[in-house]
Each structure stands twice: as structure tokens, then as C-alpha cells.
Amino acid sequence: VVSLVGRPNTGKSALFNRLAKKKVAIVFDQPGVTRDRVTRTVSLGDRQVMLVDTGGIAFDKRVTKDPLDDETRSQAALAVEDSTVCVIVVDAREGIAPLDAEVIRRVRESGCSCIIAANKCDTVDDDWRAHEFERFGLKVVAISAEHGRGMEELVSETVSRIPVADKEEEDSKKPLRVAIV
């Protein structure tokens, strides 16, 4: 399982749609559009993975004042708990927000393998904005979910963190075939 997490309006759903190669998640330029987890089995490189889009995580009730935020946080926490890899999506144009730091801290504490996808780096000239996020000590990939920039590197980095199931484990998941002759 690979989950996309982050604060509201960083482009998680746009990235989900880009990786799914289909418009599955609703994308709208307003916080709080995604509330429940959206899942889809997708091909990343040579792997089939369950990709999960989560709602934007907000922790401060004084700021959000939305009763659904607790449920959105809960859904995101479940996604992180179930994940092998968490892609933390940040808005590189806005730089590091306190909420980004809090999301990164909490996801790292989960023990999940983490990558930061610095979104909204629409051109090569924007990539410098992604470097600010390197201070968290995680792999940072400059991307543009809207334009498809950086997807190869993000997919490669993600796939490299997914353990390869051994042959015996794969065989045990296959249905048993029986023939009576």
C-alpha cells in the first residue's frame, strides 16, 4: 500500500489521478474536498500497488473549525498505518508551513518509509523550491502532478522502497487449482 498524505490543498488528489492514469479523485482548488480515503490498484513501474489518496490533514481545531476534520485525520492515520510507503505531498510554492512539519513528524513516527513529493514545481526553474524540504532528512522529489514532471523519479523512488515478495509468499496468495480426472 502506498498512501499520499499531507496538509490540505497540496495536490494529493491531482497526484493520485496522475499515478492512476485516470481521473478518479475529485480535484478542486479548495481545501477539504477529499474526506474519505480513495483507493485504486495501479501499476507503478513493474509493480501492482494499492494507491490511497487521503484528505488534507489539519490538527489545529482553532484554525479548521470543521467537525469533519477529526474523521479526515482518522482516515489518513488508518492509511498511514496500512502503508509500506507514504508519499508526503507538500506545496513547494508555499514553502514549509508549520502544518507540513507536523504531518512529516507524525508520519515519520509511524515507521512507514517516507518520501516528500514537492508538488507544484511546474518547470525546472521551480525545482529550487523543493530543496527547502531536505532539512527533514527525507528523500525529496520535485514534481508537478498537474503537468507530469518528476513522475518517473517519484515512481522509481517509491518502488525501490516496496519489498519484493518472495516466490513462496506469492505462490501462497494464488488460488489453489484442483483438477479431478
Question: Where are the model-predicted features located?
Answer:
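Short, conserved beta-strand segments within well-ordered enzyme catalytic domains
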Residues: 16, 26, 50-53, 87-89, ...
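Conserved nucleotide-binding/hydrolysis micro-motifs of P-loop NTPases
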Residues: 32-33, 56-58, 93-95, 120-125, ...
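Conserved G1/Walker A P-loop phosphate-binding module
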Residues: 1-82, 132, 163-181
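Conserved C-terminal guanine-recognition region of P-loop GTPase G domains, centered on the G4
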Residues: 71-139
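Canonical P-loop GTPase G-domain recognition
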Residues: 113-115, 120-171, 177
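Noncatalytic linker/hinge segments flanking ATPase motor cores
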Residues: 45-46, 90-95, 156-160
